[in-house]
Amino acid sequence: MSLFRRNEIWYASYSLPGGKRIKESLGTKDKRQAQELHDKRKAELWRVEKLGDLPDVTFEEACLRWLEEKADKKSLDSDKSRIEFWLEHFEGIRLKDISEAKIYSAVSRMHNRKTKEIWKQKVQAAIRKGKELPVYEPKPVSTQTKAKHLAMIKAILRAAERDWKWLEKAPVIKIPAVRNKRVRWLEKEEAKRLIDECPEPLKSVVKFALATGLRKSNIINLEWQQIDMQRRVAWVNPEESKSNRAIGVALNDTACKVLRDQIGKHHKWVFVHTKAAKRADGTSTPAVRKMRIDSKTSWLSACRRAGIEDFRFHDLRHTWASWLIQSGVPLSVLQEMGGWESIEMVRRYAHLAPNHLTEHARKIDDIFGDNVPNMSHSEIMEDIKKA
């Protein structure tokens, strides 16, 4: 077992009983403390190997090892965010002392952390301006959020039991079933209202999303080197796509027009701010700067002004897909255009294009034998208005 330093932090390198070589952070810059932790870990491993003891590991040590082993995971930032929640409840607690009851108790008290962060910012602003402090009103989280946090701690504790041999038996954690919500999409008139209410550069981003179906992160992180205007194609790199494979995006006239309007604003990023903005501390941002993926203020304000409720940015992708399906695009083609990994992920839009079932449904007409006129949608609506 040896010690080495990386970026001022001390690490230990050692071999497991099975021969596997492991490197782990000791979480300290102090060499003496690192040596003490090293010796403790060495003695612990000896007891595990020779006596069959389980190591006395805390929850944060398990979290640290998880993050180190999953360093290349695309959704690592999401893992960190969920781990941060669990550390609020189990920091300093030994793994063997974490029970199902304690886990469920923590989840039952979950509140939206973003709401609390916004409240804290408002408190600081009120203090600076000498105004009355706002009251904190906790916002409950969805079943889906609870399910994702439970899945996170379940994965860590399962790894502690099966892979790291730090637990004799991990708690049995049941993940609540999450119902698939309806596909939320906009009518063309609603989309036009939303676009009209969006300030730049959000307006261009929304247009591009509706024209291509790309996810927000792919649009905000889009670079000029990923675009070939002559061939009318854009590329999403494998490390940036949800399916972990490269995606070619066909650029229609609308998308090309949006891109041409961005030329000359930045040498690298396609979509950027061009006007300075005030920060919470009163300072100003640079005029030309990359857009933030997590910024929602302008989006929510535009939706409110347009009279559109319960609509997320990702629903623009649903809108794009819904429009294509209603225009007669086959599911298999939509899957390729949207870069979905399986056809099952596209079937959520199938109900929007039931026209291919019409001929089969007409078999019932043959059974009744009635002479039923084949009326168009406009004719039917006209008759309804007359009634």
UniProtKB/Swiss-Prot annotation:
The keyword DNA-binding applies. One of its GO terms (molecular function) is DNA binding. Keywords: DNA integration, DNA recombination, DNA-binding, Viral genome integration, Virus entry into host cell. Pfam families: Phage_integrase. The keyword Transferase does not apply. GO terms for biological process: chromosome segregation; DNA recombination; symbiont entry into host cell; viral genome integration into host DNA. Residues 181-362 form the Tyr recombinase domain. One of its GO terms (cellular component) is cytosol. PROSITE patterns: CB, TYR_RECOMBINASE. Residues 57-161 form the Core-binding (CB) domain. The active site is at R215, K242, H314, R317, W340, Y349. It comes from the Bacteria. Belongs to the 'phage' integrase family. Encoded by the cryptic lambdoid prophage DLP12. Integrase from the cryptic lambdoid prophage DLP12. Integrase is necessary for integration of the phage into the host genome by site-specific recombination. In conjunction with excisionase, integrase is also necessary for excision of the prophage from the host genome. This is Prophage integrase IntD. The lineage of its organism: Bacteria, Pseudomonadati, Pseudomonadota, Gammaproteobacteria, Enterobacterales. The gene is intD.
